[in-house]
Amino acid sequence: MFRLVAAIAALSFAMPAQADWHVAESDHFVVYADDSEKDVRRFSEMLERYHAAMEFVTGREAETPSPSNRVTVYAVGGKRQIRELAGSKNVGGFYIPRAGGSMAFVPDVRPSTGELEWSMTILLHEYAHHFLISSSRYAMPRWMDEGSAEFFASARFPRDGEVHIGRPAYHRSAELAFAPEVPLEDLFERGRHRAGEELRRDNFYGRSWALYHYLTFDPARKGQLLAYAREIAAGASSIDAARAAFGDLGQLRKDLDRYLMQRKIKGFVLQPEILPIGEISVRRLSEGMSEMLPVMIRSKRGVDREAAAALLVDARAVAAAYPRDAGVLAALAEAEYDAGNLDAAIAAADAAIAIDPARKNAYVQKGYALFAQAADAEDETAAYEEAMK
């Protein structure tokens, strides 16, 4: 418990108080960053082009999410801040999937036209999971989930607007070269990693990427990946589906090994005209919200009651300095709710709504607090009816 509170306290000093935060909103993403409007916009465009590229390559068209279900990306300022936020020295970025809107935390939003930073690869990998799961009716075996995510996450974004998909997964090269090899039978049968289970130090991720890439591009295997997915959808086990779709697994292993020895491999080079994206709006946050955002980021990361109480001190200080900023007051309402102060959360939300009746987060936090109160009310029915108004 002490380590969590200490990490939050450290982060409050690590993030600059005087900042120039921008928020970019697009069809599928919301991006917060203490960076220039130009870089924030380019980063958002890159993410939207990545989404469009996945739609084009897979032939799937995912429904545009509601504003509250978009993926929110927080650029926290640097690798040190990421490590403090994650509570780990070995984290370059991380992603938190949630039904009500997933979140990603990255060091910065400076777009790259070359090889991506590890934190960006993580974001693209996890968003690939998000896209593929949300656009499919059937769950796929783990190797295919991870192999497809690695396949898309090795993307590249040149300045001319192209998107390159299916490039070599250079971040898996050492794993493929030196880690113990996963037999194909094990690759097909391996299930999800369970909490507390020891991680296997083998080339599962690299091998999954290699097999997915091979089955996507090798002419002799054309249609087999789709046949495998159909076998799975029909109820076959992963290993039985593999034998039905791919034939002799020993021959598949030999063919895959030969494929990986090639000097060059294929990939998709997608032109910007076939990857249309929607409008992206970028705005500078108010001075108050710029000061409140580091508090919000720590809160969004997830806090327990003790850590929430420590965060609340900062939230109240910012709100006292900016009492007429509806965004700040809505964030205060969230901090009060996290700390268990339901009446104070409702009061802060009401104050935000009085200033800006369109402030969505204020209504959300007020609703949370009212429903929490209703659970302990003497007349639960009346309390829930009031909360739903």
PLM regions and their residue ranges:
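Beta/coil-rich, acidic/histidine-enriched accessory regions frequently appended to metallopeptidases
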Residues: 23, 234-374
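Juxtacatalytic substrate-recognition/specificity segment
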Residues: 19-141, 155-159, 190-202, 234-247
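Conserved positions within tetratricopeptide repeat
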Residues: 222, 226, 253, 309-312, ...
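Inter-repeat boundary and helix-capping residues of tandem alpha-helical solenoids
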Residues: 117, 138, 201, 308, ...
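Acidic/His/Gly-enriched intrinsically disordered linker/tail segments
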Residues: 22, 87, 91-106, 136-282
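N-terminal signal peptide c-region/cleavage motif recognized by signal peptidases
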Residues: 14-16
